């Protein structure tokens, strides 16, 4: 999944102005063990990555893994914070906001996605991107994630997914179409699917029925 995350972000930023001297600031929300945060921090065009998670246990794992890489130990390169997005201080200026805010495999676990997303928006710099991944609420996704992944194959623990919390791509589009300051025409989405023996693969049109990436740009 991680290589697809990076390629999707690159595709979103393809037409953004390139400023060689300007490096990117990331905010990774619900970072878990730091898989994406670490990989983003190693990119040559990255200035810094702030990764947050409300669960202390997973951050201990992330911190331990970070210490294995001298690059990640450079001051300001990768910072883990044990906090929720609701408790993270709001940026006081454009410079304090982030070029890319990521939310991977989190939205399908929250009770109220609308208010939750509202807490993310101020952290995105004007001209920056909010990039997330989640699961569409369809019978196909229920069969794949609840029945096959949990009950049949045992890939994830039972009870990991609550189908009623899944969020459809058109619901996210509708949310940002009404949200002031966001470019609804910039929305990008891409379906992805786990193929046993081959890993995660892009599935064009898969955003309508299964796992998908979703991104939207904040207006300048």
Regions found by a protein language model. Give the residues of each.
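Conserved alpha-helix/loop element of class I SAM-dependent methyltransferases that forms part
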Residues: 2-24, 39
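Class I SAM-dependent methyltransferase SAM/SAH-binding core
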Residues: 27, 32-87
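A C-terminal cap/extension of S-adenosyl-L-methionine-dependent methyltransferases
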Residues: 75, 181-220
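A short acidic, Gly/Pro-enriched loop at the edge of an enzyme's catalytic core
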Residues: 86-101
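A short SAM/SAH-binding and catalytic strip from SAM-dependent methyltransferases
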Residues: 100-111
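A short glycine-rich, Lys/Arg-flanked "PGG" loop and its adjoining helix->strand segment in the class I
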Residues: 114-126
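Conserved class I S-adenosyl-L-methionine
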Residues: 129-154
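Acceptor-substrate binding/catalytic loop of class I
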Residues: 153-171
């Amino acid at each position: 999944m991680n290589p697809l995350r990076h390629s999707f972000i690159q595709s979103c930023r393809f037409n953004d102005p390139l400023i060689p001297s300007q490096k990117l600031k990331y905010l990774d929300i619900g970072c878990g063990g730091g898989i994406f945060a670490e990989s983003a921090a190693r990119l040559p065009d990255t200035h810094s990555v702030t990764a947050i998670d409300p669960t202390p246990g997973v951050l201990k794992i992330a911190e331990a893994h970070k210490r294995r890489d001298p690059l990640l130990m450079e001051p300001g390169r990768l910072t883990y914070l044990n906090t929720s997005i609701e408790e993270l201080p709001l940026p006081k200026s454009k410079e304090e906001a982030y070029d890319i805010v990521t939310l991977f495999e989190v939205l399908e676990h929250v009770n109220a996605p609308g208010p939750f997303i509202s807490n993310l928006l101020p952290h995105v710099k004007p001209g920056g991107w909010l990039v997330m991944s989640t699961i569409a609420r369809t019978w196909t996704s229920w069969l794949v994630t609840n029945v096959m992944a949990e009950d049949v194959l045992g890939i994830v623990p039972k009870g990991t997914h609550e189908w009623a919390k899944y969020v459809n791509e058109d619901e996210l589009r509708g949310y940002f179409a009404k949200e002031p300051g966001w470019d609804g025409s910039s929305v990008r989405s891409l379906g992805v699917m786990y193929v046993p023996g081959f890993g995660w693969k892009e599935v064009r049109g898969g955003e309508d029925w299964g796992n998908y990436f979703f991104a939207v740009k904040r207006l300048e």
